[in-house]
Amino acid sequence: MNNIMIKRLLMLPLAAAVLLTGCAKSEKTNDHETTKRYLDAWVGVNYPGVTPTELGIYILEDKPGTGEMYDAKQTFVIADYTIRDLDGNVSSTTDKKLSQQIGSYNASYYYGNHVWISGEDSMAAGVEDLLMGMRVGGTRTALIPSWLYTTDRYKNKSDYIKKKIKNEGSSGIYTVTLNGLSNNILKVEIDSMEAYSKKYLSGVDSTSYGFYYKQVQAPTDTNAFKSDTTIYINYTGRLLNRQVFDTTDPDTAKMYNIYSSSKTYKPVGIKWGDTFSDIKMTSSSSDD
């Protein structure tokens, strides 16, 4: 796993895993029974012999993995995914190459492993059903009906079909590769950071668990900043896959294809404080 901003990145896959808003064409209807008949017919034509699971998703393709088996009790699911509508149009993907092929690639976006929170109230019922029986390393493609986008849980399939879902989307085809499972996502992140540090930052230091730094130039003044001081810095933000996602340097931005003419590339102000929680980044620059 190679994402460093776990709190921020968690929100992205959760939006896909909880809302699961695919864009199927012309089959959306308030009558779930009618939609179900449409999906049965679509599967019968395109995937003869495939029948729905007990909950109601259609597993279209399955490449088994050999690692740990998914268990809903596992708190975190680490996965790659691609979402398509019934015509095959991609609405969302973590696959960089695929994104480039379809013209939706954005150099500032993160592509790769995403983290979903498992279980009721967090993961959509249809995604949980897709993951059931999967092992780490496996890839599964399934058609998930729109009524299984809910994070609520009911006793049987008919209960899901009867319920109306607020802001319900259309049914979609989800291809998911299960890359890992964990009850301790912090350890996963720390292990990834330590591996990165050993590979790219020889001589790295740490002042606390989970914080690593490498001094590339000694300061000319080692006196501590006063709490009312504003300092100005340049920075470049990089994910653990080496992808640059933000910078104050225009040349660096151009090099990594994230330059924007609407952005001002200048040192940013840091308002110092007595504790780390008091330290704030401001929008002001040194020549404002």
Task: Please report, for each region that a protein language model flagged, where it lies by residue.
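Cross-family detector of peptidyl-prolyl cis-trans isomerase
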Residues: 23-288
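Sec-dependent bacterial lipoprotein signal peptides
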Residues: 1-23
